[in-house]
Amino acid sequence: MFRFVCVLFIALVVFCTTTSAGELVCNRPNEEYRCGSACQTTCATLGQRCPIMNIRCNDACYCKEGYARYGDDTGMCVSISQCNSKRSAIAQILRSKQLSKNSGV
């Protein structure tokens, strides 16, 4: 029985070490594969610290330096200057909707 358990354990170790996940392919514009934070840099979270503390970094596709994801963690990487202009455009639309609502139009 002991011999069977040892053989099973060794087989499990060999299986686990040979079936590790392959490297992700990051082929979208301004994106690269690296080991990084648990939080993606997004336009909505620029300048904020990631609230998740990792023991080890995460292997994933991240935006290159100077870029952030537009939308959620899977959005396209856009330049940080585009984040600010898109935020301004959205804020302006919301303000105009609020003004038209207040004026009864």
UniProtKB/Swiss-Prot annotation:
Its main location: secreted. Residues 26-83 form the TIL domain. This is Venom metalloprotease inhibitor. Belongs to the serine protease inhibitor-like (TIL domain-containing) family. It is found in: Secreted. It comes from the Eukaryota. It comes from Bombus ignitus. Keywords: Disulfide bond, Hemostasis impairing toxin, Metalloenzyme inhibitor, Metalloprotease inhibitor, Protease inhibitor, Secreted, Serine protease inhibitor, Signal, Toxin. Residues 1-21 form the signal peptide. Disulfide bonds join C26-C61, C35-C57, C39-C50, C43-C83, C63-C77. Expressed by the venom gland. Inhibits metalloprotease (human MMP3), trypsin, chymotrypsin, plasmin and microbial serine protease (proteinase K). Exhibits antifibrinolytic activity by binding plasmin and inhibiting it. Does not inhibit elastase, thrombin or microbial serine protease (subtilisin A).
